[in-house]
């Protein structure tokens, strides 16, 4: 399974890219706004750091506006992917962009039927949101399970990006289910390294080694 980093912070992306963990990046207007920089400038810089797909979201809500923005964004780099909201106008834009060879990531997906519609429109990626479903009492990972099963049933090539990831458990379950990608904030990616027994074991090894050195004196 691929790991995407869900952030527009260039320093965070560099840090995890150096560890070989960043297969791609997803951004949205909120994340870019936090950086206080020009939108296009930030996206272009991220594309230069990461070889994999970099998702940048359109602001327009009508199909014509989305397509216009998408074409401009696509000029920034070859690895740009256009994030399009799961709406009727969004699917119209996806169909047009797909025909032009521009990759798309359909976002704000909350049901298997939405994921199926996005795939039929020609989406390269689809982003079901698990955390937000958990927030309202649903089981977010059940959505991922259903989407993966449907895509497998019909040999659909659209890749599933598990989004709205809140903790490492989401990443683990996504991998077990067979999702293609999990996109996560830096705080979650950082926790993938951790286990209390690892810390205890390392501390014990170091203590034993220190005692061994003392015994050799």
UniProtKB/Swiss-Prot annotation:
Residues annotated as the enzyme's active site: 83 (schiff-base intermediate with substrate)
GO cellular component, one term: cytoplasm
The EC number(s) this enzyme carries: 2.2.1.2
GO BP of this protein: carbohydrate metabolic process; pentose-phosphate shunt
Disulphide bond pairs: none
GO molecular function annotations of the record: aldehyde-lyase activity; transaldolase activity
Pfam families: TAL_FSA (PF00923)
Keywords assigned by UniProt, alphabetized: Cytoplasm, Pentose shunt, Schiff base, Transferase
Top enzyme class: transferase
Catalytic reaction annotation: D-sedoheptulose 7-phosphate + D-glyceraldehyde 3-phosphate = D-erythrose 4-phosphate + beta-D-fructose 6-phosphate
Subcellular location per the Swiss-Prot or TrEMBL entry: Cytoplasm
Pathway: Carbohydrate degradation; pentose phosphate pathway; D-glyceraldehyde 3-phosphate and beta-D-fructose 6-phosphate from D-ribose 5-phosphate and D-xylulose 5-phosphate (non-oxidative stage): step 2/3
Keyword NADP found: no
Biological role stated in the UniProt entry: Transaldolase is important for the balance of metabolites in the pentose-phosphate pathway.
PANTHER family per UniProt: FRUCTOSE-6-PHOSPHATE ALDOLASE 1-RELATED (PTHR10683:SF40), TRANSALDOLASE (PTHR10683)
Family statement: Belongs to the transaldolase family. Type 3B subfamily.
Name listed for the protein in its UniProt record: Probable transaldolase
């Amino acid at each position: 399974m691929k790991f995407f980093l869900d952030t527009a912070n260039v320093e965070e992306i560099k840090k995890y890219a150096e560890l070989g963990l960043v297969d791609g990046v997803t951004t949205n207007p909120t994340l870019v706004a936090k950086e206080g920089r020009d939108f296009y400038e930030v996206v272009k810089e991220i594309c230069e750091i990461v070889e994999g797909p970099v998702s940048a979201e359109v602001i327009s809500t009508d199909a014509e506006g989305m397509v216009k923005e998408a074409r401009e964004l696509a000029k920034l780099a070859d690895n740009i992917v256009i994030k399009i909201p799961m709406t009727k106008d969004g699917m119209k834009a996806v169909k047009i962009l797909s025909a032009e060879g521009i990759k798309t990531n359909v976002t704000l997906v909350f049901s298997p039927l939405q994921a199926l519609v996005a795939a039929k429109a020609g989406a390269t990626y689809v982003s079901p949101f698990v955390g937000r479903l958990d927030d309202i009492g649903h089981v977010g990972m059940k959505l991922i399970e259903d989407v993966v099963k449907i895509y497998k049933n019909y040999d659909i090539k659209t890749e599933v990006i598990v989004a709205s990831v809140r903790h490492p458990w989401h990443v683990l379950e996504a991998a077990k289910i067979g999702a293609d990608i999990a996109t996560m904030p830096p705080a979650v990616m950082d926790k993938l390294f951790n286990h209390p027994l690892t810390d205890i074991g390392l501390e014990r090894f170091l203590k034993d080694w220190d005692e061994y050195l003392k015994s050799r004196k």
